Every structure is written in structure tokens, then in C-alpha cells.
Amino acid sequence: MSNSIEAKLQEDLRDALVDYYLGQIVPNSKDFTNLRSTIKNVDDLYDHLLLDTQVSAKVITSRLSLVTQSVQQYINRIALNLEPGLSINQQEATDWEEFANRYGYWAANQQLRMFPEIYVDPTLRLTKTEFFFQLESALNQGKLTDDVAQKAVLGYLNNFEEVSNLEIIAGYQDGIDIENDKTYFVARTRMQPYRYFWRSLDASQRNANSQELYPTAWSEWKAISVPLENVANGIVRPIMMDNRLYISWFEVAEEKETDSDGNIIVSGRYRTKIRLAHLGFDGVWSSGTTLREEVLADQMEEMIAVVDRMEDEPRLALVAFKEMSESWDVVFSYICDSMLIESSNLPTTTHPPKPGDGDKGLSDLDDYGANLVWFYLHETANGGKAEYKQLILYPVIINRDWPIELDKTHQGDFGTVDDFTLNSNYTGDELSLYLQSSSTYKYDFSKSKNIIYGIWKEDANNNRCWLNYKLLTPEDYEPQINATLVMCDKGDVNIITGFSLPNGGVDAGGKIKVTLRVGKKLRDKFQIKQFSQTQYLQFPEASSADVWYIGKQIRLNTLFAKELIGKASRSLDLVLSWETQNSRLEEAILGGAAELIDLDGANGIYFWELFFHMPFMVSWRFNVEQRYEDANRWVKYLFNPFECEDEPALLLGKPPYWNSRPLVDEPFKGYSLTQPSDPDAIAASDPIHYRKAVFNFLTKNIIDQGDMEYRKLQPSARTLARLSYSTASSLLGRRPDVQLTSFWQPLTLEDASYKTDSEIRAIEMQSQPLTFEPVVHDQTMSAVDNDIFMYPMNNELRGLWDRIENRIYNLRHNLTLDGKEINMDLYDSSISPRGLMKQRYQRVVTARNASKMNFKVPNYRFEPMLNRSKSGVETLIQFGSTLLSLLERKDSLSFDAYQMIQSGDLYRFSIDLQQQDIDINKASLEALQVSKQSAQDRYDHFKELYDENISSTEQKVIELQSQAANSLLMAQGMRTAAAALDVIPNIYGLAVGGSHWGAPLNAAAEIIMIKYQADSSKSESLSVSESYRRRRQEWELQYKQAEWEVNSVEQQINLQNMQIKAANKRLEQVEAQQQQAMALLDYFSERFTNESLYTWLISQLSSLYLQAYDAVLSLCLSAEASLLYELNLGEQSFVGGGGWNDLYQGLMAGETLKLALMRMERVYVEQNSRRQEITKTISLKALLGESWPAELNKLKQKTPINFNLEEQIFVEDYQELYQRRIKSVSVSLPMLVGPYEDVCAQLTQTSSSYSTRADLKTVENMLTKRTFADTPHLVRSIQPNQQISLSTGVNDSGLFMLNFDDERFLPFEGSGVDSSWRLQFTNLKQNLDSLNDVILHVKYTAAIGSSTFSQGVRKILANINNDE
């Protein structure tokens, strides 16, 4: 029956079954009672059966395939919530989508889980730190050597040292569940200029049994690329809001003011800014944003930052404060929503006004911020202050007189209470309330002698219940009443306090309603403590005894990095030694004996990378570069199966063979749960997988090393290859026996679901019972455990045994690596000293075989290889130019950044100079003001003297002097009168007498004296008057000079004020320039084309450049090999090994190779002379003679025959020729071939040789078949085992068209005519009865020797013929 008819019948049967199912089964079957309304057509049937009932017969399927597709469809529908009543959680849906809903993905994922060691690749590790990426970049920038590796490791250690001993300044716990929350830390370097970093701790990533944190619980330290030079007190606070990390800080700058005289004075006020920055999802920090800026009277000293989630919309509260006393503080805050918009509808807070609130004028914003959260400072044992913060309920105190309203029918009944206080305190999960009064109760009741006062709680429906109450009588004095409210969650609590009559129920008559805003207090708090030089994280003493973190301490810093740097500068062996890894140099947290470095602690990720991932990656790189000896040497830092029994490290407790602590320390089982499909995570969880990976790598590397030696086709190299394979076989041991008999019994899924794993059950019976935990989805665990499914064979490991066995088999049967037969010398050919020198400097493997007698012949001739090499060299030169431009650009950016940094330093220096200039000017101004005051005092003094002129005392003295002069003149006048009277006789008697004759003269003298006295008095008066006048003139001069001096000093003061203003302006200018320079530096640092980008580009291009150099060098060496092969130039070398210089990033390597190509081209043009072109036809029947019938019989039986084309048959034709090399070989088969019938035969050249010089000794050895040990000018078997397939049997060269201008070498081209061959017919059914001969058409070239050489060859032939 044809396929089309059968397909039509199958489709008709399908349609009939569908119609029957819809028409009979669905309407009549009890199983479809509830489904009849939903299954109406084939589409409904598809939704029910999850099978396409309209599929055509062209679709190839099976029952099992259909069932699998149906189940897959079913689970997909559950994941999409299309199956009523069935659903899976988000994690299960994600796992199903990523790993399980496609068989290919599921199978690959299972392979990753079962055999992670196979897929461990150090270059593809997902959890590399930024420092490790930089180490990789350094290793990729040039030829990988020990010096390069040491430099890269030193760079890694320098980076690690910077973050190993950071000062942690803040932390933020994102939530209130200390067991599972993420905590973010901010730290800074201990030396200026400060650099800030952040990291996180995920407390949920811990071992289920030991409760120890996994190393991956800690993220790496990452730099905060935000300008933080002006951070006040070094305080930076992290916050997590809306799944985004923020940092907040505040900046304080003292305000400067100018007085009325233009002087710059300190105002005592502080410009304060609250700033915020966030980490973008691309890992780039935003520039800082100023949220609030004001000038405050107080200098803020501390800051806290929290997210308040008590409302529907979370609020970010940033509170800067200054502690004024033990009971109150000054705050400066910013409260905003998740969009950073300042909140205006803040919740009402009720608390007492703090001292000074009215004076300070705190806003509602500050009022909310002051009471939302608060902090405590506690004195530590060593005198330091350790701060920790908690959300608390601020104490609420209300003082009020409350009227008592009784039932309205009781008119006139009332009372008052004075000085009533409601206090609250939040402790643990309890809200304690108490009513208190400091005065007596006053009430006047006419009808009721008792009254109830108490505390009620009101729910959302205004229903009230008693918390506590007291029954009072007029005689009672009840100072207080207490009540406790157990809190279940944060939120608002309505409390009602008041009075009621005894029969008034729970309704408070006189009442006041208070809404208390309650926040959950964080009872369990992290604390960052320091003991000596050790900084550690102190977990709290939990209230519950079964909490894992009770009193736990985790070291945060390490001082081990400096020790590592010191060792790395001397030798990498010291860094990676077992002694270093087990050094007890870590100071104990609370004193005591020193501790080992913690591989699983806060710095464990760095120690893992240093002691394991780094040497593994370097050895991996060496293997990729085919430098297997270096790879073996580096992998010994991890695993050395060849170590001596007296190894000193064994005495230190090192386990045999293993040299890396991360591979032998007891791991935290279950770490793989965090990344169940990551082979590195699985291996880190159980390092036996890492040990297997290292073991497999070492074994493969040894095999690869053996393969490299095997390809050299030298006897000694084969010996080394055999040793490598034996070593790898010894490491693997015997191949495990596998039982091929299968006892599998088919099972249904239902039966399989009831099978259990007996071994797991036995382990469970032996284990201690675990604490019951709620069942959650775990993608690492199977839904059903049973023992009917087993792990498959590790084909990768089994392949190593197969590979070794294949290599050993080929060695034992004289085959090449790919299984072809070869003929080899008994001993190696000698290597020239030049070749040995070249071997030391060549980079690629193809250039390491210094002897050009054993190089691999390229596929292409010299001219096409030259063109390809030129193209590759031009590309390499372009790569080098691009690399140089990138290096120049990076250096330019580095120089610009350096200039900017230096400019910043110079600006700071200029600012200091300007400030000193201002201080000098201010001092000069003060001196001028003193001088002005002195001049003003002199002016005032002399002006006062001038205005006063003669004092009253001096005037009185003048008057007295005038009176004295007048008195003296009167006395003199009286004396003159007396003298005149003396002339008159005063005796009257007998004689007249008694007169004095001299009296007139005396009188005259007295008159003269009177005149003298008068003149003298006048002159004295005039003298005094004139002296006073002169004195006044002097005073006038003095006060005028003082006035001029005051004016002059005033001008100088004005000039000095102008200079101070100018200096302040210059200072502002320099500060603005500094800010602009810093902003420009920040722009240069943060822009995309920054220095780090060029560093990355240089790293990537350096790696590409090195690989391009390897590729182009291989092309050039192939071109060189083609040239040497074509022109038979022997051991000449054109491509040197010094083209690449690691010191200069390999620049000019392309130009060096270009010069080598030009030299090769010149040699090719000069020496590519035309050779003799000869064709020789050879009959195997004639060549083999008597043995031909037997050989012909072998051919007819499809058995291969071997024959030789000896040098002698060619020498007999032309004695003056040498260097006979085959150009092409074609075969003619004289036989009858039917129409459309082909010949199927293979011709293989097993060996060949030719002489390179016209040397008679070489010719004699070739003709006499003597040993070739003393024949230096003989080339043997350059490219053995070349083969052609014959199809026509008529001058058949094995090619569709024989083209002597082909870019590729022709089969057998360049080999010697002195050769060995193997011929075989391969078609077992072909009739060869008509075959009677095999004709070879050999076309070869040869060089012409001298006549002397020709005569010598003839003599050798004559001697051979005579001997025969």
C-alpha cells in the first residue's frame, strides 16, 4: 500500500474517532457529567486531552512522545494559571520556565548538577570580583609570564589591601528580621584623601545546619564614585528604598558676613545641606542632589537615615542633629516620599515641646523627624562611643483639665481634675500607659458618691474595652493608674482616658482621645565594634534562645594583606605556599591566640580568589596557549601528585598532594542552594568537585603535552609523549568495570511515584531530628525520591581513558596522531645552534620546532601565503596603531586628571595664600585703626588746647603779674616822692638843716627805676602773651597735623578695606575655580569615555592584539615554511623571535613581520630560478620483474602492495642532476572497464628522500642504501603518508583537473623521487582480472650540478654495476 493511501486511511480513522468521542463518549460517559457544557468541538477536546486531535499523518510521533508533550503542556498551563484550582509559586514557575519546560535545557541543567567538575571554567566564573577582573585584564595585556603574573597578583593585593582594613562608618538593615534581612555597610579608607566603599550582607544565605553564613552572603567592596570631599564629620549613611541603594550625608560650612564697615566677620551660623545620591541599575552612581539647604544657628554633628513604612506610602527620613543635652537635641531633617518629593501631610505627633522649641522655630518637618526615630550613644569598655539606633515611641505627656460630663438627666453633676498626665512607654511588644496627677482631685457630686476613671482602647469600629480602671470615692487620693497594651504590629493606637459613673458601662463620660503613633522597636541590633586593630560585627543577644545569631561575632577587616604584599614582592611561591595559607596572623576578636585567615568570612571571597581561582586561571591560560609545562607548574600550587614524601609542608599538617586550603577545608554544605545551576557554586559548596576539576585539568594538560610531543614525529619526542600518556594513565588508574547487563523493568509513573530511596531512608534513621520548618519550594530537590533512577556515566572522564588508549595504540603501531602510518628515523636529526636560539624566542608552538627538517609543510604555495600574510600583517599594524592611540589617549586623560588634581592642590594652596593675605590685610587694618585712633586723640587734644587757648589759671597768673607790676610802680613812685621830700629841710631851729643833697638824684634814679620797672613789666607781659600766642600756633599746627593724619589714615583704612574686599573676591574666585576644577574632574571621572573605559579598551585590545600577533606570526611562519619548501633553502630564517616586546606592549611587531615578508619576497624573486622539468614513465611490471605476478595477485585480491622508486633509476637517466623532487604523480591502469564504471584504488607515499646539494657522498649513500646518520644533505619524509584516490585509471592524478598553477601544493609535490609507495584497490566487488600492469607517470624537477659532479656520479654507478 502506498504511503499516501495509508496516510489518508489514518486521517480518516482519526476523524472517525474524534467524532465518536464527541458524539458518544462525552454526552454519555459519567466521567464527563461536569464537562459536557465545555467540550463542544475539537478545540475544546484539545484543551481537555492536551493532545492535538487534528494532527496529520505527516507528523512523526510515538506514544511516549505524545504523553511527554501532554504532561509538558499540562504543567505549562498550570504555570499560566489556566488550570482551575491548580497553581505553582513564583519560584517554581521561574524554574520551570528557565530549566524544565524544554528537554534540551533540562538535560543540560541536569548535567551541570550531576557533573559540575566537567563544566568548571575559571574564565567563565560568574562571581568574579572587580579586582579579579582587573587581574584578568592585566594577564591578558601581553605574553603571560611569571613576571606578568607576579605584577598582576601585586595589583590584586594592592586593591585588596585598600579594602581589607576599611573603617566602617555606617550600616543599614533593610527590614526588622535580622535572620533574613540584607544589611548594607559604608566604609572609608583610613588615610586621606578618603575613598568610600559599600558592600552588603545577606543574612539569609547561611547553612541550614550550622547556621554559618556562606561566603557569598558578603558582596565585594565596591567604590562609591560620588564626590564626598565636603562630608561633615565623615558621616555617610546608606538607605535602601524601593529596591535601590541610596547614600545620604550632610555638609556644613560656616557662614561669613560683612559688617557695616565692609569687614569680613564670622557669623556663628552654618550653611547646612542634606544631600542624597543613588546607585543606578547600571551600577553607576548619580551625582549628589541637595534636598534641603538652610543657614542654622547650630552646627549639626550627627545624622541618621531611615525609611518609615508605617504609612501606605513609605517615607524617607534624613535627620541631622546636634546633641544639646542628655534630654533634647536640635534637628535638621528632610522627610520625603519615594519620589524624593518633600512630604507635606506628615502624621500628627504629640509630644512635649522640647526646651527651646519656640526659640528655634522647628518646623513640622523637624518635629516629625525628631520623633520618628532616635538614637542612643553608649560608652564602650575602652572609652569609645558605640552608637546604635532604634525606632521608638516618643514619650507622650498631656497636661489638661478635663470636665466630667455625666448622664444628661443628672444635671448639675460635674467635676474637674487638675494637672492630669498621660504617659506612655514602649518596651518590647508592650505599650505601657499610666495616668498620673500631682494634685488632689476636686469634684462635687450631688447624687453619686463614687466615680470610675480609667483607660480604654478603641478599635477601628469605635468599640471600646477596658485596659484598667479605678473606683474613686471622695475620700480617695489615687495618684496614678497603669495599663499595658500588647502590641501585635506597628501602626496607630487610639487610647481614651476619662471618667465614668459606676453604672455607666465602658463609655467614658469625661474623655479625651489620644492617637499614639507606635513603631516597632528594633530589639535585635547589629553593632560594629573594635578590639585593638580588629573591627568586627557584633550580633545581638537575642531574646529567644533558639536564634542562630546569639552573640555571634564576625571579623570585618584583616591585616593579612600587608603580609601578602611583602611576600608577593619576593616570590609568588611564598604567597601561595601552604605555610602562608595557614599563618596565624589574624588578631583574635577579643584577644587571645592569633587565628587563621577566615576563608568563609567577610573577606573570604578575596582569599578564595587569591589561593585558588587565580592559580587555576593562570594554569588554564597557559594550557590554552599550549604552554603545557608552565600550566603543570602553576597547577602544582593546587594539586601536586608528584610531591616527595619528605615535603616540608607535610610536617605542617598539609594533606598529601593538595596545596590549597580552599580545596581541603570543610565546606558549608548547601551553598549550592543559592545557585543550583552554577557549577562554581556547586563546587564551592562541596570542594570535591573543584578537586575533580583540577585533577581532570592536570590529566588533560599532561595528555595535551604528550600530543604536542607526538606531533613532532621525532623518536625522542615520541618517547616523551609515551611518558606523558603513562603518567596520565597512572593518575587515572584502571578503567572501572561497567556492568552492561540491564535489569530494568518497565514501570508506570504511578508505580514509580511510590518508590523510595532505601539509602536515604537509612540515613534519615541515623540522623538527629531537625526542627520543623515550613515546606517551601527547593529547586535543588526532586519532588519524589526513589532509587530506580541512577546517574549516567561520566562520559568526559571515560573519554580520558579512551584518549590515552588511542594514543598508546597509535604509538605501538607506528601511526601518527590521527592514525596514519609513518616511517621515522631511528634517531633525531641534530638541531642547529641558530635553531635552538630561535626556539627560545618564538612564541607560538609551530615555531618551537627549531629544525626545519621536521616542520609541517603548509597547504599553500609561497605566493598565496605571502598575500595572506601581508593582509594579516596590515591588520596587525592597524591593531598596533589603534592600541598606541588608546595608550596615548589614556595617558592624555591620566595627565589631564593629574593636572586637575594638581590644580586642586594648587587651588588649596592659593586659597591658603589668599586667606593669609586677608589675615595680613586685616592685621594691617587693625594697625591703621590704632594709628587713626592715636591721631584722632592728638587732634582732639591739641584742638581742645587751641580752642581753649589760655586757661583760667594762666589768665589769673597774668592778672596777678599785672597787679604786681602796678604795685611795684606805685612803690617806686612813693620812693621817688620820698626822695623829693628829702630835699626839704626837716629841722627848723637855730639852723636850717636835715635835708639830703643827694635826694634829687635819688629821686631821679627812682624815676628811672620806675620807668624801668614799668617797661620791664610791660615786656614780661608782652613776652607771656606772645609765648601764649606762639604756643597756640604750635597747638594749631599739631591739631591740624593730627587732622591731616586722621584723614590720611582714613584713606589708608578705606584702601585697606578695598584690599580686603578685593582679597575676599580673589578668595571667592579661587574657591569658585577650585569648585569648577573639582566639578570638571568629577565630569572627567564620571563620563563614559573616562580613563577606566580606555583601561578596559586597552586590556581588550591588548588581548586581541596578542592573539592577532599569534595568528599573523603563524601565517608568516607558514609563508616562511612554504618559501623554504619551494626553494629548498634549508635552515634559513626570516621571521625572528624578537618582534614582540612585552615591555612595550608588542608595538612595532607588525612592522617587524612586514620587514620579514619583504625579505622573503626578495629572496623568492632572486632564487626562484627555473629547474629541469622531467617526466618519467614507470611500469611496475618491469620494475618488479619476477615478483610482479605475486604482487599482481595481491592487487586482484584487494590486498595492498608496497614498492619503491629508487634514486638509481632516475640517476641512470641524468647523472648531472640532483635535488630531484616530485611535481606530480599520475597512474594509468591497463585494464578493461565497463561503461559507467570507475576504478577504486588508493596510492600512498609512505616515505621519500632527496639530496639538497650536489654532494657525491650523499648520492653514494642514496644509491647504496647505507645509513643516513652521516648524510647531512639529505631530506627524508617531510610530509609522509600523502595519499590520492584513483577513479579513472587513465593518467589519473587523483584530482578533478591537474593544474600546475594551483595555489595549493599538488599531491606528493616537493617530496623526493627516491620514495616508497603502497597501492591498494578498495572496491571489493570490482573485477580486476583484466589488469596486467600499473603505469606511473612521474613528473619531477631537478637542479643541474657541475661536470665534476656528473663524472663522480657516473663513477659511482659504474662501481655499483661492477659490484652487481
From Swiss-Prot:
Disruption phenotype: Cells with a disrupted yenA1-yenA2-chi2-yenB-yenC1-yenC2 locus are no longer pathogenic in C.zealandica larvae. The keyword Secreted applies. The isolated toxin complex includes 3 peptides starting between residues 768 and 778 of this protein, which might be physiologically relevant. It comes from the Bacteria. Pfam families: ABC_toxin_N, Neuraminidase, TcA_TcB_BD. InterPro entries: ABC_toxin_N (IPR046839), Neuraminidase-like (IPR041079), TcA_TcB_BD (IPR040840). Keywords: Coiled coil, Secreted, Virulence. It is found in: Secreted. One of its GO terms (cellular component) is extracellular region. Residues 1025-1080 form a coiled coil. Part of an orally active toxin complex (TC) with strong insecticidal effects on larvae of the Coleoptera Costelytra zealandica, Acrossidius tasmania and Adoryphorus couloni and some Lepidoptera larvae. The TC has an endochitinase activity. Semipurified toxin complex consists of at least YenA1-YenA2-YenB-YenC1-YenC2-Chi1-Chi2. The Yen-TC:K9 subcomplex is about 26 nm tall and 22 nm in diameter with 5-fold symmetry and 5 copies of YenA1, YenA2, Chi1 and Chi2; the chitinase subunits may be solvent accessible on the exterior the complex. The Yen-TC:K9 subcomplex has no insecticidal activity. The native complex with additional YenB, YenC1 and YenC2 subunits is 16 nm taller and is insecticidal; the toxicity-conferring subunits are present at about 1 copy each. This is Toxin subunit YenA2. It comes from Yersinia entomophaga. The gene is yenA2.
